[in-house]
Amino acid sequence: ACGTKDQPVGDVIAGNLCRCTGYGPILDAGNAVPVSARDDGDTIALLQGLRREQPLTIHSHDPETGVDRHWLTPRSIEQLADMLVAHPTARVIAGGTDIGLWVTKKLDRPEALIWIGDVAELNTIREDRNNLVIGAGVRYSDAHAALARLHPDLGELVRRIGGLQVRNAGTIGGNIANGSPIGDMPPALIALGAELTLRHGDRHRTMPLEDFFITYGRQDRVPGEFVESVRIPRPDPNSRIAITKLSKRFDSDISAVCAAIALHFDGDVVRDARLAFGGMAGIPAR
């Protein structure tokens, strides 16, 4: 069937709007479709072969506005840092799930775009006994398993972010850096006590994630600075965590409110409580 053990048919058709027969026949039809294994190795090898040895740089001049525009593709985190120092107002783009809408809906025309998909240092996931560290360029689909191991509610939250195509493109770092008040990940990460690492040139700084959001549309990031990674502490056995997303539709919809609660118990006594919310103000907060 078109659904598999790792990807149920319900996930495949997530966001489908049915206005006639109901979802039962759609699910039945999906489960009845035979699926044979597909080898994409040759296609992937061909696409990887198109990658250039040197970073692809495109410069153009807009004669109507007199503006020079740049497309830059660093291959290392050092190149990225240098490019952002040289172009401090550049937009960093990973999956483009937000910036694409800014261009098509708001008619935004950034002077410089820096694509980070080939920066290996931003595409790492590190786990140890105490922390999970996710690079800013890691896509939701790639982070899903590690987040689900951290706590099942985190895995379920990620599964409800957009559709599969969005999760295959969008990144957790982008969800944080863009500062949307209805971003799904920040409330959960704030409740868990996550910390953010930022970089400007060769300088790093770390802050609690909740301090990154100042007010609507404004984050604690100077021009030329970028999000490098987010560190999520591993919950201890005495913690209880619950994460809930409310939206008009279950799948592929923005949050009306996203709530995350982390309680630390000492026996039957709550010693610490962290409650974080998104969608209720100009920034996610606790």
What is each stretch, according to the model?
Residues 1-286:
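C-terminal structural segment of proteins
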